[in-house]
Design a protein with these regions (language model features):
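Short, surface-exposed secondary-structure edge patches
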Residues: 216-220, 236
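C-terminal soluble interaction/assembly domains
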Residues: 225-291
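Cationic-aromatic interfacial patches
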Residues: 19-98
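Short alpha-helix capping/helix-loop boundary micro-motifs
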Residues: 205-217, 231
Length: 291
């Protein structure tokens, strides 16, 4: 059962609040999975500060390893009302990388409170960093990357990789499959709102999966890089997300919230081998947290 919390923080914000505190003060409505979420988040942030790590990629990897074994659960953000959902106990492939971003960004700012984590979640999950209704959520990874790059959260490194290619595609899966989305089934007004933000003839960089075993490509990838799997499914840009872990031999692996594995896990095969079995994933995009 979800617990609702209304935070009235604006009046409590100190006069000389930091940017992080000001962001935290804007959070209005939240939904927690259970009452231990805030405790677990605070414990994770304390571990991050104690680690002494300052590099963003190193922190992403550190926190990903802390979350190994967390159950995979889909649709945790969905409810009758759009609320800022915080669920550290159940993750899907997108909430996993959002969580890694929020933890890492808090630690880089020397913050150790779940409130800072929550502000970072709102910042990365919603267009312009502000939660509104369902349409304010960044549903498509292509817009998610663009919006977060413009606001200084993320940088895409795909264009700088050797052998990069480009694809042009309409990103409009949601409005063509409204029955698959609870909030769109019987709400034509919301469908039209979503349609406004869908991308037409969108050109984006990607690396074909055949290059993932290339020495130059492997040398350009870092542990803690975010990665998305590009799909050939009509109307969709990507179908899965995770992070890269580079082993001692220089081979990149995928660490993800795995639907098939049922938990956050490090995949057993190198990334190029992992993608060989897929009939729909044709390549990858790679991005990092901005310093």
């Amino acid at each position: 059962m979800f617990y609702l919390m209304v935070l009235l923080l604006v009046a409590c914000a100190p006069q000389q609040a930091t940017q992080q505190e000001a962001q935290a003060a804007t959070i209005s409505k939240m939904r927690f999975h259970c009452d231990s979420d805030t405790t677990v988040i605070n414990q994770l942030l304390a571990k991050g500060l104690e680690s002494g790590l300052t590099d963003a990629n190193a922190l992403v990897e550190f926190y990903a390893r802390q979350l190994l074994g967390t159950p995979y659960v889909a649709h945790t953000l969905e409810g009758d009302e759009e609320l800022l959902t915080i669920n550290i106990h159940e993750l899907d492939c997108l909430t996993f990388i959002e969580t890694l971003y929020a933890l890492t960004r808090a630690t880089m700012a020397h913050r150790n409170s779940w409130r800072d984590f929550a502000a970072n979640i709102e910042n990365i999950r919603y267009r312009g960093g502000e939660m509104g209704d369902y349409s304010s959520r960044l549903h498509y990874i292509s817009e998610w990357i663009i919006d977060n790059h413009l606001r200084g959260n993320l940088v895409e490194v795909t264009p700088d990789l050797p052998h990069v290619d480009y694809m042009v595609k309409n990103i409009d899966y949601m409005t063509h499959h409204t029955d698959s989305y609870r909030q769109l089934k019987n709400d034509t007004a919301m469908v039209e709102k979503i349609r406004r933000y869908e991308l037409r003839n969108h050109r984006f960089p990607y690396l074909k999966r055949s290059w993932l075993n290339d020495k130059e490509v492997k040398a350009a990838l870092r542990s803690g890089d975010f990665i998305t799997l590009v799909t050939k499914i009509e109307g969709l840009d990507v179908s899965h997300n995770g992070i890269i872990i580079v082993d001692d031999k220089g081979d990149p692996y995928l660490l993800d919230a795995s639907m098939s594995g049922g938990k956050v896990m490090l995949e057993s095969k190198p990334l190029f081998k992992f993608l060989e079995r897929s009939k729909t994933n044709i390549g990858v995009r790679v991005f990092r947290i901005m310093p």
